[in-house]
Every structure is written in structure tokens, then in C-alpha cells.
Regions:
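Short, Lys/Arg-enriched N-terminal segments with co-localized hydrophobic residues
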Residues: 1-10
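A short beta-strand-turn-helix
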Residues: 13-30, 71
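Conserved helix-turn-beta segment immediately C-terminal to the redox Cys motif
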Residues: 28-32, 45-65
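Short pre-active-site segment immediately N-terminal to redox-active cysteine/selenocysteine motifs
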Residues: 29, 36-39, 81
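Structural cue for short, hydrophobic secondary-structure segments
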Residues: 34-36, 87
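Structural micro-motif
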Residues: 71, 77-86
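Non-catalytic, surface beta->alpha helical segment in thiol-disulfide oxidoreductase systems
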Residues: 89-120
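Short acidic DE-rich linear segments
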Residues: 119-128
Length: 128
């Protein structure tokens, strides 16, 4: 019942799977991912905040990954705690943090993600 509630609440949020992950990350400039599970109380509590923010913030693709159904993606990103938020910009991971945020903090974080100098980020990635 709670996972149904979560799914209904996040209708405007794209559900990522192994089959659409690469395409979604590649075809959208900024993508935020909410790693969650249907049994996770804090994940279910965060769902309304995530959805409300998705309706306010423009230029960001809001997505979620059910770590129970997409265990390979959770393992690939070494998700150890949920919820975990991750942001990609221009296909590069620029933020990852376990835990949820308030709506205001989430909006501020996404606005900051829009202003990051990606030329500098790409240089850092090349030097690794």
C-alpha cells in the first residue's frame, strides 16, 4: 500500500531502470535521482517534498530509482543508505548525499547545480 502511495505521489517523476538510465542521463542537462525503497519510512516521508520541488524547479529532470527493483543500479552507485540523492549534470555525477532535504534546501541545491562551472568539472574528471 505504501509503495503504491509513493508511486502515485511521484507520477511526474521519471522512474529510472537499467533500460532507461543511460538515455535519461545523456538526454537531460541536469538530472536528480532519489534512490528509495518501498519499505523505507524516510523515503516515503520525503516523496511529497521531492514531487513538490519537481513542480517548482525548471530545467531539472526529477527521477527515482527503486533500489529493491533495480539492485544493480544501487550497487553500481554504492548506495548504502536510503534515501540518497544524486545529481548529474551533462552526464557527470556532481553530487551525492544520503538522507533527505527540506524543500527549500533541495531547491537551493538544484539552483547551485545549475551554476557549477562544468568546464572545471570536466577538467577534474579528465585528470582522475
Amino acid at each position: 500500500m505504501l509503495s503504491y502511495f509513493y508511486r502515485e505521489l511521484c507520477m511526474s517523476v521519471i522512474e529510472l531502470t537499467q533500460s532507461n538510465f543511460d538515455e535519461t542521463i545523456t538526454n537531460n542537462e541536469i538530472v536528480i535521482i532519489d534512490f528509495w525503497a518501498p519499505w523505507c519510512g524516510p523515503c516515503l516521508q520525503f516523496a511529497p517534498t521531492f514531487k513538490e520541488t519537481s513542480e517548482k524547479v525548471e530545467g531539472v529532470t526529477f527521477t527515482k530509482i527503486n533500489t529493491e527493483e533495480e539492485q544493480a543500479l544501487g550497487a553500481h552507485f554504492r548506495i548504502r543508505s536510503i534515501p540518497t540523492l544524486m545529481i548529474f549534470r551533462e552526464g557527470i555525477g556532481i553530487f551525492s548525499q544520503p538522507g533527505s532535504l527540506s524543500g527549500k534546501d533541495l531547491e537551493d541545491l538544484l539552483e547551485k547545480a545549475k551554476t557549477i562551472n562544468m568546464d572545471e568539472v570536466k577538467k577534474e574528471v579528465e585528470n582522475q
